[in-house]
């Protein structure tokens, strides 16, 4: 019953999300440290963190990197990655969020799972009820029953590290009203279980209705919200430069046509231009490098085409060579 209402394609390691965006090595380290310190209770303010920024700023890459880190370290977490460009319709369905989080918590917490299973047997119609009712019956009330000692025993963690719940791409849920409703429900749940070590990391664009909900809900006013705006990240340009250097190094080391490359290509001037044109939208740099690194083409010619695109911002996206890389994503970004 529970699994049938989940969005399995929205999980951090789902097959549908093969090769998801993530932070390149040695990039966004300060942002990641701030998030990890907040999760680990070294930063005491906020039960909820809002990671925001414009399209392509790197929100999903950071969320994916944090989620994978928790998985690798066997630290309990649950996640949901919305996506409007996914082939899976479940990844834009806001009604799938709560069951999917509950499902993951059931895998982590044996006693919690028993409580949830009993509730589902008693009321198999629970997923036909409101999202508020689902969250109260299957999330808030069961977790309120746990003492702190019992909670940490359940998550099998010797250190008091909170349970992390990640919701990425909330703005890509298909219905803006549902987006706001889910935010309100998360805020109410966070307030109800504030004595439990649980953190909610929400990543989204700063859409007006989402910003308004964060600004107006009383829970977020009472020192329970922490914000990170990637558009204001002073390290964005350095992170993009580090990424570009790493990717061009790979081309020099392994591209089929690497022996035709100038050993000093590209120049620092070109790297600086790419950083200037990309920052703070990391996705432009990553899309450009996918295009340039194509094994069937000459990288220097591809870079020249990219530079031509970046210097003709008024040209239609259909004429831009970058559109051949991840075409649906590219068109989605540049035709907004």
Label every model-predicted segment.
Residues 1-336:
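Conserved NB-ARC/NACHT P-loop NTPase core of NLR-like innate immune receptors
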């Amino acid at each position: 019953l529970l699994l049938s209402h989940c969005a399995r394609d929205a999980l951090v390691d789902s097959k549908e999300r093969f090769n998801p965006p993530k932070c390149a090595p040695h990039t966004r380290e300060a942002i990641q440290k701030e998030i990890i310190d907040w999760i680990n209770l070294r930063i005491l303010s906020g039960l909820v963190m809002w990671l925001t920024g414009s399209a392509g700023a790197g929100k999903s890459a950071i969320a994916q990197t944090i989620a994978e880190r928790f998985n690798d370290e066997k630290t309990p977490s649950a996640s949901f990655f919305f996506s409007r460009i996914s082939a899976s319709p479940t990844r834009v369905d806001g009604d799938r969020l709560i069951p999917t989080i509950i499902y993951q918590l059931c895998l982590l917490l044996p006693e919690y799972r028993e409580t949830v299973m009993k509730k589902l047997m008693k009321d198999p119609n629970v997923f036909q009820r409101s999202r508020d009712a689902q969250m109260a019956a299957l999330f808030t009330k069961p977790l309120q029953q746990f003492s702190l000692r019992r909670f940490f025993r359940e998550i099998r963690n010797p250190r008091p590290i909170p349970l992390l719940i990640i919701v990425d791409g909330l703005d890509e849920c298909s219905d803006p009203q549902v987006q706001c409703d889910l935010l309100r429900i998360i805020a109410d749940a966070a307030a109800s279980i504030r004595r439990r070590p649980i953190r909610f990391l929400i990543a989204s664009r700063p859409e007006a209705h989402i910003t308004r909900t964060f600004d107006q809900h009383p829970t977020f006013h009472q020192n329970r919200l922490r914000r990170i705006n990637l558009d204001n990240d002073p390290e964005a340009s350095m992170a993009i430069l580090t990424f570009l250097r790493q990717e061009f190094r790979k081309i020099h080391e392994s591209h089929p046509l690497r022996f035709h490359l100038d050993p000093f290509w590209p120049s620092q001037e070109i790297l600086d231009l790419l950083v200037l044109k990309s920052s703070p939208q990391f996705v432009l740099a990553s899309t450009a490098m996918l295009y340039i690194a194509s094994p069937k083409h000459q990288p220097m010619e591809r870079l020249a085409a990219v530079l031509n695109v970046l210097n003709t911002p008024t040209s239609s996206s259909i004429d831009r060579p970058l559109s051949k890389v991840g075409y649906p994503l590219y068109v989605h970004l540049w035709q907004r």
